[in-house]
């Protein structure tokens, strides 16, 4: 950092000390600080080099110089035991970026597009009136959480935006309630669980999911269902979340009746209706069946 003395040594023919001091004192930011803090003559003398440092750093900041090292922070003047000093505070842009990063860090997406982290309820297209009932329920959940615990089971046609809606919910829960959510593509999770059998990691995968603060199972019913996955994986997750009263959301192309039929189809055509109903009892307890209307957006 170049001091006042360095400036005078470098350009002795152009600057005299008093001329430089007057130039520094006339700087609008410096003058405002002097008036605000009611600096005495002694304090002014002790502060000249810091005022010069401030002006240099401020101008670099405003120009966006590449050699400005405190990226995301702007220089400010503060009092420091009888003289002015230079400090740095976060810019509004850095604060906003850090806030958005914190929001996204609370959203865990598993086998889903990272772009869903950008979704928010404010982006929901309400010109499509079919979305309004679901939008209102999701908004109410955010506003009333944690008093409200029951999730939604969103079903509807392919491409109407079910995944976007629940991702928007997760974003707003993070932003407004500081809540962490796990958004999980269920068919891919089923494959991951099957692959984990050989490694002995099934319990680790299941525990990670069932303990989520808010859990969203996306596209349930699209997986290749087996009795083992249904009874030993899904039911374990749902049972835990039911017992602990943890918010759980679902999306599906099936309504409740169709999903039960999906779970009831055994590997060899066996009727497994009773087992399917046990799973559905837990889903019904955890989530309200809600149809999402709308146009295909894909």
Language-model regions: role of each:
Residues 194-246:
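Conserved nucleotide-sensing/catalytic segment adjacent to the nucleotide-binding pocket
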Residues 114-148:
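N-terminal pre-Walker A segment at the start of P-loop NTPase domains
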Residues 55-112:
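Interdomain "pre-motor" coupling segment immediately N-terminal to P-loop NTPase/helicase cores
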Residues 1-71:
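N-terminal nucleic-acid engagement/recognition segments and initiation subdomains in replication
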Residues 170-182:
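Post-Walker A helix-loop "phosphate-sensing" segment adjacent to the P-loop in P-loop NTPases
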Residues 146-167:
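Walker A/P-loop nucleotide-binding motif
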Residues 183, 216-218, 247-253:
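Structural recognition of the conserved hydrophobic beta-strand(s) that form the central parallel beta-sheet
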């Amino acid at each position: 950092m170049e001091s006042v003395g360095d400036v005078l040594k470098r350009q002795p023919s152009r600057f005299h000390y008093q001329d430089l001091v007057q130039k520094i004192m006339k700087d609008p930011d410096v003058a405002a600080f002097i008036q605000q803090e009611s600096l005495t003559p002694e304090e002014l003398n002790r502060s000249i080099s810091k005022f010069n440092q401030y002006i240099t750093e401020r101008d670099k900041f405003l120009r966006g110089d590449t050699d400005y090292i405190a990226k995301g922070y702007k220089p400010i003047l503060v009092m420091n035991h009888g003289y002015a000093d230079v400090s740095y505070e976060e810019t509004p842009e850095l604060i906003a970026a850090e806030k958005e990063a914190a929001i996204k860090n609370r959203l865990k997406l598993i086998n889903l597009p990272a772009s869903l982290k950008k979704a928010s309820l404010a982006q929901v297209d309400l010109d499509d009136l079919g979305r309004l009932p679901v939008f209102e329920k999701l908004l109410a959940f955010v506003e009333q959480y944690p008093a409200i615990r029951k999730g939604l089971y969103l079903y509807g046609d392919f491409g109407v935006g079910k995944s976007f809606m629940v991702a928007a919910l997760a974003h707003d829960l993070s932003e407004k309630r500081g809540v962490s959510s796990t958004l999980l593509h269920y068919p891919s999770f089923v494959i991951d669980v099957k692959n984990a059998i050989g490694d002995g990691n099934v319990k680790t995968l299941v525990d990670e999911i069932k303990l989520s603060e808010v859990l969203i199972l996306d596209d349930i019913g699209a997986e290749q269902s087996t009795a083992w996955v249904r009874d030993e994986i899904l039911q374990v997750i749902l049972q835990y979340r039911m017992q602990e009263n943890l918010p759980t959301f679902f999306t599906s192309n099936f309504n409740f009746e169709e999903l039960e039929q999906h779970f009831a189809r055994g590997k060899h055509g066996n009727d497994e209706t009773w087992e399917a109903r046990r799973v559905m009892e837990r889903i019904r307890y955890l989530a309200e069946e809600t149809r999402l209307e709308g146009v295909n957006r894909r």
